[in-house]
Regions:
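Membrane-interface coil-to-helix junctions
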Residues: 18-113, 135-157, 196, 254-259, ...
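Active-site-proximal, structured, solvent-exposed surfaces of multi-pass membrane proteins
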Residues: 2-4, 45-46, 626-857
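Membrane-interfacial loop-to-transmembrane alpha-helix junctions, especially the N-terminal start
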Residues: 7-10, 123-132, 169, 174-179, ...
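Periplasmic/ER-lumenal interhelical loops and adjacent helix-loop junctions
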Residues: 224-340, 382-389
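Transmembrane signal-anchor helices characteristic of membrane glycosylation enzymes that use polyprenol
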Residues: 6-39, 44, 237-249, 428-430
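Contiguous transmembrane helix-bundle modules in multi-pass membrane proteins
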Residues: 193, 307-320, 327-455, 819-857
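Membrane-embedded helix bundles of polyisoprenyl
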Residues: 15-19, 105-119, 127-211, 231-251, ...
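Extracytoplasmic/lumenal acceptor-recognition loop(s) of multi-pass membrane glycoenzymes
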Residues: 69, 78, 425-449, 466-540, ...
Length: 857
């Protein structure tokens, strides 16, 4: 009873500390959520999943028509499509999902800390050892930080810790439920990090197996090990099968993403052990423990028990040999984030080390040598570390550990308080480095900005635009680049469709079209961030008829003023689906240069076989645009240096500065200015950004994780009637602008391209189904601005037809003259196979339960 009271006090203290630490980390006036990644991905995608569930009632969705033009929803499964944490939020329709996700993240963190404590206590560690180790786990680099940033990095931890308990239960009581259930929930919460989690579970499983055999005084034979190992692996495999409905279609979606880019690596680099102190220790993107962890792993190699040595060696190899990090990151890159799932296992090894140290079961030589080795290693790595402060902290940490280890060998008093003496400084150093990381990043969302971004008044403006129009068009929210970043995936209404997307997985054709074919501006340093475009031609092509904005937008007419922003309308925007016979072939399109490669979409659809040549297109478009001068004013004032060269400009800016550039006057109506040039970065480790009339292009540092390779800056900016100048903002840096071309013109309002408009059935169009009618005046092509995917199934009047890629990246098919009922159904590749696999997993679980019941009888 006394022990249970002590446990309860520890658990209450751990929960209180967790909540306090999370709230303290937000600072003054902020929320427990970060800008960009959290606000535009980890809180927004769950809201969209819930929104689609309410609209369709489908628990297993397949298509996300609303985001990124319309994509396989398993491109976004990483963000919690079937996560039990997210699914609970479905039961709270009146609570903003972003509010729920903040609370859920703190609850998950507290649950993980408590379960870890209970697991350690169940392994017969003292309450002090278990509690202090749980505190170390709480303050480890990624735990609090990622709970408000990249929540998928850590929100699976309760289920992972639960599964470690399940392994103990499996070997001690021969019960599989907790092992299978915990693994299944971990996968469903974060399939990406579950791979590392399963590897950690496997290592611990081997350790527990050997220890169980030793206690039972049984010999381990090769045959017995293989047989028992297969039975254990069978439980893990059953959990994987249960998650088949998530894993199979997600794998198919990832395999279809041919546009993914990985780091170049060689075999020697992958197999050579490396310890990057700044990434491996303390950081939020790795296990994030102190240098004590290195000491413990090295000391473990000298333990007496073979299985204890194997566990330490296994962890050391996985953590230091880049091959494992590379493999756990899907063979894309070598980054320590995939090693975060080893954190609970490292905490177990810490508790084990403290127990042995206190009971003097580690020889003095084997206790001191690892400490000395780590101190020397850290000292020698001084020049390799970017932060001298962190180097000093690491060295101090290692020296303190060395001194405590020496002192406890001679002092019974220190041995009595050994856990506090060893882990106290470690926890303090984790808190200090954690606070430093929070302060340095400074990217938490302010409460004021959060309330503005999630204000229902914006949603009401979107609702009004949709309700006013019975057609099939897109409605987008536009602000400055920071606001646009927050709203990359935000959808307010299940009938709102947007072109933007920010996801680690995406439709490769759509991404390639934006970047290489059409050459949309890239305002962000991360190539995955596909922003709303300010290009009026792209907006017209993609059917962006309505914009919600607080600024006047050339080419759009203000319709209404609302509390959430003004509603602007462009009556000339293309429908999302229409029929036309004005076509040109892909081969001819590929011959077009800028800006004809963009303007062609105002007059023609690009198909496999077209009717006009590139020359004819240029001749036709010459009616709308003409080449013009675009001269940047030269300047040399000590802060800004802009000098013209034979082929462009040499620029050296100490800070961002704005210039006024003359352009041909728009005499009759709003027009468009097209500008394109190449950029050569003289300081490639720094970013470059240049804006024209607020439309920004950015070239990221070559060292950036998601380097965007944006070396050609392309602009198409709207000009108002009578406008004679434009604002050009040159960002800080040293670079060359060359091969510049500029054109000025108007967008022709009557090109006859949209000959027959698809009338969508808004009641039937939801989930993975698009349905409606069209009255085609003549034979032609049915054109959409929905990205092409092999999962589409099309029927005309109930007859299945073959779909093809049109406009280089979108869905289309041949259509004969007449009245037709169109039905477009999307089947995510792998969904059926995934459901079958899940069904087999359920049958295996049921069969196992029945068999166990019969054996018990």
């Amino acid at each position: 009873m006394k022990e249970r009271r002590k446990d309860l006090l520890w658990e209450m203290a751990l929960v209180l500390l967790t909540v306090t630490a999370c709230l303290y980390s937000t600072g003054v006036g902020n929320i427990f959520g970060a800008k960009v990644d959290w606000s535009s991905q980890h809180s927004v995608f769950p809201e969209y999943f819930r929104q689609q569930f309410y609209r369709t009632g489908q628990f297993f969705p397949e298509f996300a028509l609303n985001i990124g033009g319309g994509q396989n929803i398993y491109n976004f499964s990483y963000y919690g499509l079937f996560s039990p944490v997210v699914l609970i939020g479905y039961l709270l329709p009146n609570v903003k999902m972003s509010d729920y996700m903040m609370v859920a993240s703190i609850v998950c963190l507290a649950a993980a800390v408590i379960i870890l404590y209970r697991w350690l206590k169940s392994r017969e560690f003292t309450a002090v050892v278990s509690g202090m180790t749980a505190l170390m786990f709480l303050f480890a680099g990624p735990m609090i930080y990622q709970s408000s940033h990249q929540i998928m990095f850590v929100n699976y931890m309760p289920f992972l810790c639960l599964t470690f308990l399940g392994i103990d239960r499996y070997f001690e009581q021969k019960k599989s439920g907790l092992l299978i259930g915990g693994t299944f929930l971990m996968i469903m919460t974060s399939f990406y990090f579950s791979i590392g989690g399963i590897l950690a579970l496997g290592l611990y499983g081997i350790y527990r197996y050997a220890r169980t055999k030793e206690r039972a005084e049984e010999m381990i034979t090769v045959k017995g090990f293989l047989g028992d190992g297969l039975r254990f692996a069978g439980r893990i495999l059953t959990a994987i099968m249960l998650a088949g409905v998530l894993l199979v279609p997600t794998a198919m979606a990832l395999l279809g993403r041919s546009g993914s880019r990985g780091e170049k690596t060689d075999l020697w680099q992958l197999l050579t052990p490396q310890i990057n102190l700044e990434k491996f220790l303390y950081g939020a993107y790795g296990p994030g423990l102190s240098c004590l962890m290195l000491i413990i792993l090295l000391t473990g190699l000298f333990y007496k028990k073979a299985y204890e040595k194997i566990l330490s060696l296994g962890c050391l190899v996985v953590l230091t040999v880049p091959f494992f990090s590379y493999l756990l990151n899907g063979a894309l890159y070598i980054r320590p984030k995939s090693l975060i799932p080893f954190l609970p296992l490292l905490c177990y090894l810490t508790a084990k080390y403290l127990e042995k140290l206190k009971n003097q079961k580690i020889g003095r030589i084997w206790m001191l040598l690892p400490c000395l080795a780590v101190v020397i290693y850290i000292y020698l790595k001084k020049d390799d570390m970017k932060s001298e402060v962190l180097w000093k902290l690491l060295l101090l940490d290692a020296v303190i550990t060395l001194l405590i280890c020496v002192a406890q060998a001679y002092s019974a008093w220190i041995r009595k308080y050994l856990t506090v003496a060893v882990l106290g400084p470690v926890i303090l150093s984790l808190i200090i480095t954690g606070s430093y990381s929070w302060e340095k990043s400074g990217n938490l969302e302010s409460r004021k900005a959060y309330e503005e971004d999630t204000s229902r008044s914006i949603g009401k403006a979107v609702d009004k635009a949709i309700a006013s129009d019975g057609g099939f068009y897109r409605v987008e929210q536009v602000g400055n680049e920071e606001k646009n970043a927050e709203n990359l995936n935000r959808v307010w209404n299940s009938e709102q469709y947007i072109t933007s997307l920010y996801s680690s997985s995406y439709n490769a054709d759509y991404q390639n079209f934006r970047k290489n074919d059409f050459q949309v501006e890239q305002p962000y340093r991360n190539f995955l961030m596909q922003s709303v475009s300010q290009n009026p031609v792209f907006r017209q092509l993609m059917g962006v008829k309505y914009l919600i904005s607080s600024q006047n937008i050339p080419g759009y007419e203000k319709k209404w003023m609302t509390g959430g922003g003004d509603v602007y309308c462009n009556e000339n925007a293309a429908p999302i689906a229409y029929e036309t016979d004005q076509t040109m072939s892909e081969a001819e399109y590929d011959r077009l240069d800028f800006p004809y490669n963009q303007l062609v979409f105002t007059r023609y659809a690009v198909t496999k076989d077209g009717t006009v040549s590139a020359g004819q297109v240029k001749e036709k478009l010459a009616e709308d645009i003409e080449k013009c001068d675009f001269r940047i004013p030269e300047k040399n004032n000590g802060i800004s240096l802009v000098v013209s060269t034979e082929n462009g400009y040499q620029v050296k800016m100490k800070k961002k500065q704005e210039f006024e550039v003359a352009v041909p006057e728009q005499e009759e109506k709003d027009g468009v200015l097209f500008v394109q040039f190449r950029i050569e970065n003289k300081k490639p480790k720094e970013d470059i950004e240049i804006s024209l009339e607020g439309e920004r292009n950015k070239l990221s540092s070559i060292q950036h994780v998601y380097y965007n390779r944006n070396t050609v800056f392309t602009y198409a900016v709207g000009l108002e009637k009578g406008q004679k100048t434009v604002r050009l903002s040159l960002g800080k840096g040293e670079y060359t602008i060359k091969d510049m071309s500029a054109y000025n013109g108007v967008l022709n309002e009557d090109t006859g391209l949209y000959q027959s408009v698809f009338r969508v059935d808004k009641e039937q169009t939801k989930g993975n189904l698009i349905q409606g009618r069209i009255k085609s005046q003549k034979d032609g092509m049915f054109i959409t601005s929905i990205p092409f995917d092999k999962g589409f199934e099309m029927t005309i009047d109930g007859v299945k037809v073959k779909c093809e890629k049109v406009n280089k990246a979108f869905l289309g098919f041949h259509l004969e003259a007449g009245k037709h009922k169109i039905r477009i159904l999307y089947h995510a590749p792998g969904v059926t196979a995934g459901k079958i696999l899940t069904g087999l997993g359920v049958l295996i679980v049921i069969a196992g339960a029945v068999r166990k019941k019969k054996c018990a009888e």
